[in-house]
Amino acid sequence: LHNCGSFLNLNDIGENSYKIVTSTEIIGLSHQERMIVAYVIRYTTGDFPEYSEIKNEFSREEYIKIAKLNAILCLADAMDRSHQQKFTNFTVRKRGYDLTITGQTLYDITLEHGIFIQKSPFFEEAFGIRPVLRQKKCL
């Protein structure tokens, strides 16, 4: 769903995805829930806005929920950036302030690791823990 805007135009995918979600009824979601989904996917490619920029549309609690969901989505998208499903299994461990995500793969994950590092600071800001991506080579 977060990449649905790419079917309209490869420029500004997040904004196009936002427009598709806001203009489409999604069975089982209220209008406000649909707006939350739209804002989560809107900022997967750009900078996440400050609360003051969208405070007329969401409460502070909703803003925090959107920010956290966006941070999770951005890391998940980074781990499959090439859209080749290079990882087969994941383990997640939290030690201190680190959240270590270890994925099993034999493939080169240079692209995924680089994007993961770019997206990590926002996740750390949203959750207060530092995400770390590790590769476990397996046969």
Question: Residue spans of the language-model regions?
Answer:
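Generic beta-strand/beta-sheet core signal
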Residues: R34, T44, T102-Q104, R134-K136
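A short amphipathic beta-strand at an alpha->beta junction
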Residues: F127-L139
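A short interface-forming secondary-structure element
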Residues: T100-G114
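Short, non-transmembrane amphipathic alpha-helical segments
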Residues: L111-R130
